Amino acid sequence: MIGLIRVLTTANAEVLHEHGRLILEMYAVPVKSDCIPEQPLGIYNDETEQLANPKIVALGKHMEQDGCKVLVVSCAADPAVELLRRNVSVPVIGAGSAASYMARMIGKPVGVMGITDTVPAVMLDILGDLFIRYIRPEGVTNTTDLLTPAGREQAIAAAKTLMEQGIEVIVFACTGFSTIGLAGILRKELNIPVIDAVEAEGLIASNLYRQLRGE
Amino acid sequence: MIGLIRVLTTANAEVLHEHGRLILEMYAVPVKSDCIPEQPLGIYNDETEQLANPKIVALGKHMEQDGCKVLVVSCAADPAVELLRRNVSVPVIGAGSAASYMARMIGKPVGVMGITDTVPAVMLDILGDLFIRYIRPEGVTNTTDLLTPAGREQAIAAAKTLMEQGIEVIVFACTGFSTIGLAGILRKELNIPVIDAVEAEGLIASNLYRQLRGE
């Protein structure tokens, strides 16, 4: 199966499995999710990223030993993705790099949407000259803010602001947007490609999984 | 539907539709294929590429007017892909760039396999530091050569040569390899990811098509 790493600690099974469940529903591949220990707030600065890196590697190595054929680090910042690749022999996919390379396949100007202050470095590096602007929906600091009618309107308004500046593709820099189905809302309202980070990691991971299974 | 451009002129319906048929079978999306006029030998040098470019743009524009939601230039050299993007508003996917970005999502050293003398520039540019070596199976100058048992052995031998040099992903620089099912043979023999150019363009094109259809 696919091993999916959540980079925040949770005992809530629904939260733990939400990305894996989406990938199973979209691509009909088995996903085993697990999370790193002792970081209930996840990764939010350099210090917490340094703290998480060896835990991500340890969990990925364990998942490989457990039989996972493809690993996914399900976070738009791609934490420890390069490091994990040096420690396992199975393919390792990061949400941020998968989404950004998918945008590059389209080759049009990109607007990035997220809820943090800045775009993950890995995404800026990959998007390069296609990157136009980053935006955070007004008043939104948590994905649950987007579940209200007002939050939804703010997300659509933010996407429209990006489009006014010439972007033709939207990329999410937040895996929380996947859980609330924001991509579907924006696609319906605006009729432009929206690259959802969990959809992108799942698209490539499920393709590799099927290959390596001999399907 | 998806509009798929073949960059060689053919009156043979089987040849014309072979990439579209593969994409339909793999991803269950409708594909309309058409080819550029008056180039039965396709693109094989700078002069024939210059000759083909305006024909690709004209065909792509016609396909967009005809209702195609996504266009695919089904050639590993990505001819006229950037030019076509400036002339239509729908997404344009190139086989070479889609396959190369897909390899970058995996992030491991890449070996490229093809039947021409050199790797398309667009693929080298994208693969960058991940590119290790290009190889052409010995004695193979035409994809039909690979349909013989000897040709098949040569392709497997070429892949093994790449792996001995440390590559962990194989990317095809020839869409003819898709038609003969070479990826499946190599995956079975060698158990490493093989990025097939038609599979890669179809993976992204079908995803975008479904998005823009509101699925």
Features from the language model and the residues they span:
Chain A
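A short beta-strand-loop micro-motif that forms or neighbors metal/cofactor-
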Residues: 98-119, 207, 215
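Beta-alpha junction/loop-to-helix N-cap segments that form part of ligand/metal-binding clefts
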Residues: 50-83, 87, 174-180
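N-terminal glycine-rich anion-binding loop in soluble enzyme alpha/beta folds
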Residues: 1-51, 111-150
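Short, high-confidence coil segments that cap the C-terminus of an alpha-helix
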Residues: 63, 68-69, 107-108, 167, ...
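Glycine-rich, highly charged phosphate/nucleotide-binding loops
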Residues: 45-62, 149-158
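Hydrophobic alpha-helical
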Residues: 72-73, 77-80, 158, 163-189, ...
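General beta-strand structural signal in soluble alpha/beta enzymes
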Residues: 33-34, 72-73, 92-95, 171-172, ...
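Short, acidic/small-residue loops that bind anionic groups at enzyme active sites
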Residues: 85-106, 186-205
